[in-house]
């Protein structure tokens, strides 16, 4: 028993909620003292035991980092293997030194078994689940995903992972597959959720309240108990998949596994393609895409040591600022800082994967260029360069971009942004606290300022910071080029002969607000809407995602995440439930208060009116959705080819929802479970066709750029990063590949041609009536005729003009 353990085994029978349960009898004063000790002590500057051991491995094998990476991965596998009695070196000190969080969680798990709380677990698992290593697995899942997953999803992932581990270690020789093992034992979604909930309970129990279960907006989730922040940082356990690699990842190829040196995946065979395995999407990966992934994986990075030191000393006010304004990200920020400290003197690589559409995602969780602002700011290119004239210019432009001063700079010319930095050099070098915190991205701007200090001291200083430029609503850029719509192309800066940046979002806002105001009397009889005036910050993401066919529900959720909330308690079925009203800005600078239903109504108005200025957008939406409906009606796979040769097939399986009551230790919780069946989800097939095609075109464009690029490139979907010296050429390459995408590849005509060829292959007859084509389908009693969608009329945009007039295509 641990020295500080406050468990004892004097079991006392108590009743709770009319259920006879066994509870532990413990010393509450001792418990309170331990809580106070944990919450009041200052942040220990030492790394967690886990990261300290990783650091030791890196130090001991700094001349052979391939060996270091292999040791880190193998030690993790030892930790995750249930049967071994050998302690993993990477966590050996965690077994021998005091570990409050893990000790308490494991003591609770043992207690649940001794009290009979695990009796309902399957016999196949019951004898194996009380294993300390599963506590570590659950803990690592919780740390990585608590802030972005529902409680039920966490339950499922942990329960599934632990079951998979037990199958691999004890039952793999008895069953052909994990699915056979699960089917034989009748392990369904509900079983995995209940098993996972037992392990999560070891971290939410009053005896180990590291996380708090909260119920908001009809969803259970977890929040960090702030009293235990220090203890959490001391108890970090992180899978190598969530960490950078210190040697080049293995190359991927046809039938060849790449990435980590060892297969670390516990749920399925490791694959380059990640995403939901509940559906049956397909991608035929080309040699070009494999080459692109391997090129990205080979880029070497290092920690921005100047920024790390600054944040831990005089710049700690930035982390305090995030702690006060974005409290839910504080722990992740602290973990990111500690990982950066661990890898400070070691070069590293960042694994990437793709989804079935070819979109590229970084695998590392806390330290990666697609992650948080802090994560991005701490990453430097391993190879620096002295800034040339264009490099200095774009470095200054980037500095203005990340300061942005309330969105002012994103609409200004590159020269105006450059001039702003020149005019504010004294403030930039001084790095005054108030000046830094006014930046839109304070951490990135601090990194910029620190480099500017170095450049002032030595103009020949080699710069290691990557810089980034963003596309202007890339989804609409693709539609404009696809439709050759000149007006739309101007709005999204494909064609721009001036020196100011066209702001697509601001162009749409007046019409959207007018529609909202007019709806107050005409349709919804809600006078609250008559004075509403939504601004750019509220509508930018809505407009951007509408080009990907976001639904009214999606718009509602986006608005709710942006609007200021007012909490209130309502009584529903005899229970108190926390709900929110929302403060919506008005024309006179005040607010109106809308409830959730009214926000949904507001979202509906926006959805119906958002693109009224651009009828051709409606025509392409109509064409693609009608195409999808015919594919579904004929039960033909919905597939298309991207311009760079990817063959993609979209297939969403239907999900069924049921409610499961989880009863553990006398407490009930209702979980909503989703299970998938091998039937097409017709609604989602139609709804998803537009975003999936656009995402695949984004991916195709990026693949073409990376394949033809010889320097660093850091892709963040529609955002492009590289060394400042290379940004001018990269911007040119972005335009050239976009022109190639749409000048030599008539995408819409090819989709239409393939659609008609598919009909022929499936012996579907096309008939013409009065100049209109119909698909002839044999029904139960008679033939049915479905009108074929007609391609939208093309406009007058010459995509070749983008080369010279698309300067602000990315800005």
UniProtKB/Swiss-Prot annotation:
Keywords: DNA-directed RNA polymerase, Mitochondrion, Nucleotidyltransferase, Plasmid, Transcription, Transferase. It is an enzyme of class 2 (transferase). Pfam families: RNA_pol. The active site is at 470, 540, 718. GO terms for cellular component: mitochondrial DNA-directed RNA polymerase complex. GO terms for biological process: mitochondrial transcription. Its EC number is 2.7.7.6. SUPFAM superfamilies: DNA/RNA polymerases (SSF56672). It catalyses: RNA(n) + a ribonucleoside 5'-triphosphate = RNA(n+1) + diphosphate. It is found in: Mitochondrion. InterPro entries: DNA-dir_Rpol_C_phage-type (IPR046950), DNA-dir_Rpol_phage-type (IPR002092), DNA/RNA_pol_sf (IPR043502). It comes from the Eukaryota. GO terms for molecular function: DNA binding; DNA-directed RNA polymerase activity. DNA-dependent RNA polymerase catalyzes the transcription of DNA into RNA using the four ribonucleoside triphosphates as substrates. Belongs to the phage and mitochondrial RNA polymerase family. This is Probable DNA-directed RNA polymerase. It comes from Neurospora intermedia.
């Amino acid at each position: 028993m641990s020295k500080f353990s406050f468990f004892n085994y004097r079991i006392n029978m108590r009743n709770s909620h009319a259920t006879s349960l066994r509870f532990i009898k413990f010393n509450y004063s001792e418990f309170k003292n331990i809580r106070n000790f944990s919450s009041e002590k200052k942040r220990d500057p030492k790394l967690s035991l886990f990261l300290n051991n990783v650091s030791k491995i890196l130090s001991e094998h700094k001349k052979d980092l391939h060996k270091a990476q292999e040791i880190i991965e193998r030690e993790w596998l030892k930790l995750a293997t249930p049967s071994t009695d050998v302690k993993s070196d990477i966590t050996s000190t965690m077994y021998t030194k005091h570990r409050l969080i893990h000790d308490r969680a494991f003591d609770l798990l043992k207690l649940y078994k001794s009290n009979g709380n695990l009796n309902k677990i399957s016999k196949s698992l019951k004898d194996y689940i009380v294993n300390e290593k599963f506590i570590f697995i659950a803990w690592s899942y919780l740390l990585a995903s608590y802030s972005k997953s529902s409680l039920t999803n966490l339950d499922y992932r942990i329960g599934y992972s632990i079951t998979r581990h037990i199958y691999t270690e004890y039952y793999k020789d008895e069953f052909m597959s994990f699915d056979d093992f699960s089917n034989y034992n009748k392990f369904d979604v509900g079983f995995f959720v209940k098993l996972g909930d037992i392990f999560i309970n070891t971290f939410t129990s009053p005896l180990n309240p590291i996380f708090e279960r909260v119920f908001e907006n009809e969803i259970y989730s977890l929040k960090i108990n702030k009293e235990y922040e220090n203890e959490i940082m001391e108890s970090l356990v992180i899978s190598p998949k969530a960490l950078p690699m210190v040697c080049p990842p293995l190359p991927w190829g046809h039938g060849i596994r790449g990435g980590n040196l060892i297969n670390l995946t516990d749920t399925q065979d490791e694959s380059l393609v990640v995403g939901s395995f509940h559906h049956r999407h397909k991608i035929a990966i080309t040699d070009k895409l494999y080459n692109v992934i391997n090129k990205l994986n080979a880029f070497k990075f290092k920690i921005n040591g100047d920024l790390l030191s600054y944040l831990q000393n005089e710049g700690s006010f930035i982390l305090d600022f995030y702690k006060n304004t974005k409290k839910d990200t504080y722990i992740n920020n602290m973990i990111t800082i500690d990982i950066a400290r661990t890898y400070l003197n070691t070069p590293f690589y960042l694994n990437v994967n793709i989804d079935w559409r070819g979109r590229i995602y970084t695998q590392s969780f806390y330290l990666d260029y697609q992650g948080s602002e802090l994560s991005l700011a701490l990453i430097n290119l391993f190879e620096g360069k002295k800034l040339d004239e264009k490099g200095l210019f774009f470095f200054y432009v980037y500095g203005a971009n990340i300061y942005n001063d309330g969105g002012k700079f994103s609409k200004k010319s590159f020269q105006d942004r450059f001039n702003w930095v020149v005019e504010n050099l004294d403030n930039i070098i001084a790095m005054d606290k108030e000046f830094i915190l006014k930046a839109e991205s304070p951490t990135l701007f601090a990194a910029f300022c620190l480099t500017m200090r170095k450049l002032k001291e030595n103009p020949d200083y080699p710069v290691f910071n990557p810089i980034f430029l963003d596309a202007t609503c890339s989804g609409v850029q693709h539609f404009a080029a696809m439709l050759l719509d000149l007006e739309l192309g101007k709005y999204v800066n494909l064609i721009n002969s001036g020196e100011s940046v066209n702001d697509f979002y601001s162009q749409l806002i007046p019409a959207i607000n007018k529609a909202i105001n007019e709806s107050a009397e005409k349709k919804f009889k809600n006078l609250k809407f008559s004075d509403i005036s939504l601004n750019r910050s509220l509508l930018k993401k809505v407009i951007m995602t509408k080009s990907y066919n976001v639904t009214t529900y999606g718009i509602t959720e986006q608005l709710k995440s942006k609007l200021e909330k007012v909490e209130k308690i309502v009584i529903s079925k005899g229970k108190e439930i926390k709900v929110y009203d929302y403060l919506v800005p008005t024309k006179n600078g005040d607010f109106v208060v809308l409830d959730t239903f009214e926000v949904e109504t507001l979202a509906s108005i926006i959805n119906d009116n958002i693109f009224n200025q651009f009828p051709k957008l409606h025509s392409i939406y109509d064409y693609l959705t009608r195409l999808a409906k015919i594919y579904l009606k004929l039960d033909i796979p919905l597939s298309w080819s991207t311009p760079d040769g990817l063959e993609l097939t979209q297939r969403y399986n239907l999900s069924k929802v049921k409610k499961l009551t989880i009863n553990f230790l006398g407490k009930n919780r209702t979980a909503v479970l989703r299970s998938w069946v091998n039937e097409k989800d017709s609604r989602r097939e139609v709804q998803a066709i537009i975003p999936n095609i656009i995402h695949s075109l984004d991916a195709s464009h990026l693949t073409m750029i990376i394949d033809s690029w010889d320097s660093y490139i850091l892709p963040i979907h529609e955002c492009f990063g590289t060394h400042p010296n290379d940004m001018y050429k990269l911007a040119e390459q972005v335009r050239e590949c976009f022109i190639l995408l749409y000048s030599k590849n008539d995408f819409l005509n090819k989709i239409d041609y393939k659609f008609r060829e598919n009909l022929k292959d499936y012996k579907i007859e096309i008939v013409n009536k009065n100049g209109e084509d119909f698909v002839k389908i044999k029904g139960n009693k008679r033939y049915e005729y479905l009108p074929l969608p007609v391609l939208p009329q093309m406009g007058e945009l010459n995509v070749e003009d983008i080369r010279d007039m698309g300067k602000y295509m990315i800005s």
